[in-house]
Amino acid sequence: MNQFGASALINLSSFSSSTTPSPTSVAVKQEPAMANSTPVGKVPVPTAGGGRASPEANQVLSKKKLHDLVREVDPNEQLDEDVEEMLLQIADDFIESVVSAACQLARHRKSNTLEVKDVQLHLERQWNMWIPGFGSEEIRPYKKACTTEAHKQRMALIKKTQKK
């Protein structure tokens, strides 16, 4: 359960690593606090003419939200148009890469449903980020592999030869 009352799950039955879900609808599963057997439903995504999603519908961060974030940091700061576009593009690319990696994790555990734990696992392992409001009781701590003595000796030899 998240701060909005229910966690959203995305159906991955039509997802492949090279394609994205249809822009007209996304399957979302609403999960009550205790029950995990709620059926999957379709949620429409706003589209512009021609059946294609508008650029505003695809963006996670709008220009207004970006300006609000900048005002929180420094009320007197103004961003150039190019900087705004670049920050919006970086945010979109980040979300796309996180969702893609989370979908691959869901596929790896042989599930057709993207769950919060998939996104959470990717963010914790790759970006060292935690999602507020979601405990990590299911995710075991990530331990880096111990370096062996043989590896240390090889690395020392490499460093020694590089100094010469």
From Swiss-Prot:
One example GO MF annotation: TBP-class protein binding
One Pfam assignment: TFIID_20kDa
UniProt keyword annotations, A-Z: Nucleus, Transcription, Transcription regulation
Ranges where the record places region Disordered: 14-56
Annotated GO biological process: RNA polymerase II preinitiation complex assembly
Main localization, broad class: nucleus
Stored InterPro entries: Histone-fold (IPR009072), TAF12 (IPR037794), TFIID_TAF12_dom (IPR003228)
Boundaries of every Histone-fold domain copy: 59-131
Gene3D superfamilies per UniProt: Histone, subunit A
Cellular location(s): Nucleus
Biased composition (Low complexity): 14-25
One Gene Ontology cellular component: transcription factor TFIID complex
Superkingdom to which the source organism belongs: Eukaryota
Subunit structure: Component of the TFIID basal transcription factor complex, composed of TATA-box-binding protein tbp, and a number of TBP-associated factors (TAFs). Component of the TATA-binding protein-free TAF complex (TFTC), the PCAF histone acetylase complex and the STAGA transcription coactivator-HAT complex.
Family: Belongs to the TAF12 family.
Function: The TFIID basal transcription factor complex plays a major role in the initiation of RNA polymerase II (Pol II)-dependent transcription. TFIID recognizes and binds promoters via its subunit tbp, a TATA-box-binding protein, and promotes assembly of the pre-initiation complex (PIC). The TFIID complex consists of tbp and TBP-associated factors (TAFs).
Name of the protein in question: Transcription initiation factor TFIID subunit 12
Organism: Xenopus laevis
Gene: taf12
